[in-house]
Amino acid sequence: MSGWSGPLARRGPGPLALLFLFLLGPSSVLAISFHLPVNSRKCLREEIHKDLLVTGAYEITDQSGGAGGLRTHLKITDSAGHILYSKEDASKGKFAFTTEDYDMFEVCFESKGTGRIPDQLVILDMKHGVEAKNYEEIAKVEKLKPLEVELRRLEDLSESIVNDFAYMKKREEEMRDTNESTNTRVLYFSIFSMFCLIGLATWQVFYLRRFFKAKKLIE
């Protein structure tokens, strides 16, 4: 990122900049490392919006020295099980795909081997949306000046924020519709239960009346 100079630098980031970081910073970048034992499977899941570019880089450190025929399989799927990326005997590489729908995506690493083998160290760096775009490459292809590149980045950032707000509004409307539907069902069920209780109470009154008449306890 380009640095600020002058009075703005002393004042620190403004509310709008903090909002950008809050909305896009944590959600568009996933950088994680973990240990993967032999003959085990670990998966990471993340919800990603529709029509977003997703890029990633991974590196798997093999500390076994090739012993035990250790192999690691990397597979990326959506909630329907469609394979977006797959790599047998993965060690180091990159991947990229574009989402077609808002969905939950799963990145799985599976290790297979024999014998006592040290755990593998897996490093995964995954980005999507604005963070996934290579603006240096875009600048070269479109012959953009540095200022134009920053303007393009801000334009994409603004569009992403607008899409996030639109999605949150849509989810809010869906949740409100669900709540209204649930309240309506609860109301109907309450009315039905009330009529059932009234009917049961009426039946009990007539039944007891006939019973007492049969026993000649009442006329």
Curated annotation (Swiss-Prot):
Lumenal side: 32-185
Required for interaction with STX17 as annotated region, ranges: 1-142
Motif (COPI vesicle coat-binding): 211-219
Keywords carried by this UniProt record: Cell membrane, Cytoplasmic vesicle, Endoplasmic reticulum, ER-Golgi transport, Glycoprotein, Golgi apparatus, Membrane, Methylation, Protein transport, Signal, Transmembrane, Transmembrane helix, Transport
Membrane topology: Single-pass type I membrane protein
Dimethylated arginine, modified sites: 171, 176
Region of interest (Required for TMED10 and TMED2 cis-Golgi network localization), ranges: 147-178
Residue span of motif COPII vesicle coat-binding: 211-212
Stretch list, region Interaction with ARF1 and IL1B: 207-219
Record flagged with keyword Iron: no
Subcellular location: Endoplasmic reticulum membrane; Endoplasmic reticulum-Golgi intermediate compartment membrane; Golgi apparatus membrane; Golgi apparatus, cis-Golgi network membrane
PROSITE patterns per record: GOLD
MF annotations from Gene Ontology: protein transmembrane transporter activity; syntaxin binding
Leader peptide range in chain numbering: 1-31
Residue ranges occupied by any GOLD domain in the UniProt entry: 41-193
GO biological process, one term: positive regulation of protein secretion
Top-level taxon of the source organism: Eukaryota
Glycosylation sites: 179
Self-association and partners: Predominantly dimeric and to a lesser extent monomeric in the ER. Monomer and dimer in ERGIC and cis-Golgi network. Forms homooligomer (via GOLD domain); the assembly is promoted by direct binding with leaderless cargos and may form a protein channel that facilitates cargo entry into the ERGIC. Forms heterooligomeric complexes with other members of the p24 family such as TMED2, TMED7 and TMED9.
Miscellaneous section: Ectopic expression of TMED10 alone does not result in its proper cis-Golgi network localization. Interaction of TMED10 with TMED2 is both necessary and sufficient for transport of the couple to the cis-Golgi network, and TMED3 and/or TMED9 contribute to facilitating the process.
PANTHER family, per the entry: TRANSMEMBRANE EMP24 DOMAIN-CONTAINING PROTEIN
Function recorded in the entry: Cargo receptor involved in protein vesicular trafficking and quality control in the endoplasmic reticulum (ER) and Golgi. The p24 protein family is a group of transmembrane proteins that bind coat protein complex I/COPI and coat protein complex II/COPII involved in vesicular trafficking between the membranes. Acts at the lumenal side for incorporation of secretory cargo molecules into transport vesicles and involved in vesicle coat formation at the cytoplasmic side.
Domain note: The GOLD domain is required for proper p24 heterooligomeric complex formation and efficient transport of GPI-anchored proteins.
Sequence similarity: Belongs to the EMP24/GP25L family.
Name of the molecule in the record: Transmembrane emp24 domain-containing protein 10
Organism: Oryctolagus cuniculus
Taxonomic lineage of the native organism: Eukaryota, Metazoa, Chordata, Craniata, Vertebrata
Gene: TMED10
